[in-house]
Amino acid sequence: MVRISLDVMGGDYGPEVVIPGAARALERHPDIKFVLFGQEARCAELLAKYPKLQASSTFHDCEIAVGMDEKPSQALRRGRGKSTMWKAIDAINADEADVVVSAGNTGALMAMSVFCLRTMQGIQRPAIAAIWPTLKGESIVLDVGATIGADAQQLMDFALMGGAMARALFEVERPSVGLLNVGVEEIKGQEEVKEAGRLIREANIEGIEYYGFVEGDDIGRGTVDVVVTEGFSGNIALKAAEGTARQIAEYLRSAMSRTLLAKIGYIFAKGAFDRLREKMDPRKVNGGVFLGLNGVVIKSHGGTDAEGFAAAIDVGYDMVKNGLKAKIEADLARYHGAEPTEALPPA
């Protein structure tokens, strides 16, 4: 059984997306037990439409929902101990949940997660890891927004955590890790990036294969399993990729509807275009993972639909099933020369 707590009020649409999304995830993973935190007046009628979900859930009524435009400091002051977001996170501390999933305000979710769960021993700052579609399948990119201007040691930590996530998600024994840079030559880039490369190379970490520097176009190519960068450039890369995907989709839509001949051609090529659309569907890779905390936190896109939210739940489910937290702790323990605090799950 995997216990998943949900911030039902999070996101642009709240329970109207979260509840049907949870129902879809339950169809795929019948061993999920949900712990729901929401406002009963808005959720009860909708939840009643999904009897299987209702039977596999416990619901906790909360008085406060965090707004999508609230500042993290304001959300903490107003919602600590009372909001749906805080209580969903705190369910991990109370041993009621193994992972929390929220589509809510990213800054507030990160602030509450750090305040409530704290960072792992040896981790200075957390990172947000995104699953990225590539020509070879999928890769992991971190950090995509949590730590702006990370130093060399923090980038080293991100490499450790990203490698552990790749082993948990992709089930590769020794994932390849690259540092995002302006060139692949050792003399190029900021001092923090060059120093991080030296740290990773000299550490000779058992669980990862250090590839060296990678450039922006290597992300989509799938050159490495894990791309490490600091939060400013990572977030820009993520938003640029999402915008490019939408741009290409719009170009195709416009080109295929411009003339009668184009419309006829689309009919014959519809299968190929459908496969392309599915490959570029952002819902398929929805679910950023907050790494470096004493608990697994999944951030869904705020504007996603039920299928996208279900995909974020899928990510959380896989992270728990494959022992993400234990893998990160074991890698940190090996790097720092200490004993892991939690036993690794059996292979």
Curated annotation (Swiss-Prot):
Against Pfam families, the record matches this protein to: FA_synthesis
**Can you say what this protein is called?**
Phosphate acyltransferase
Q: Which domain of life is it from?
A: Bacteria
Localization of this protein = Cytoplasm
Query: Annotated Gene Ontology MF terms?
Result: phosphate:acyl-[acyl carrier protein] acyltransferase activity
- Where does it primarily localize? cytoplasm
**Keyword match Lipid biosynthesis:** yes
Pathway listed for it is: Lipid metabolism; phospholipid metabolism
Which SUPFAM superfamilies does UniProt cross-reference here? Isocitrate/Isopropylmalate dehydrogenase-like (SSF53659)
Q: Name one GO cellular component term.
A: cytoplasm
Q: Where is the signal peptide?
A: none
Q: Keyword set for this entry? A: Cytoplasm, Lipid biosynthesis, Lipid metabolism, Phospholipid biosynthesis, Phospholipid metabolism, Transferase
Protein's GO biological process: fatty acid biosynthetic process; phospholipid biosynthetic process
**Recorded name of the encoding gene:** plsX
Q: What Gene3D superfamilies has UniProt attached to this entry?
A: Isopropylmalate Dehydrogenase
- State whether it acts alone or in a complex, and with which partners, per the record: Homodimer. Probably interacts with PlsY.
UniProt family annotation: Belongs to the PlsX family.
What reaction(s) does this enzyme catalyze? Answer: a fatty acyl-[ACP] + phosphate = an acyl phosphate + holo-[ACP]
EC number(s) of the enzyme? 2.3.1.274
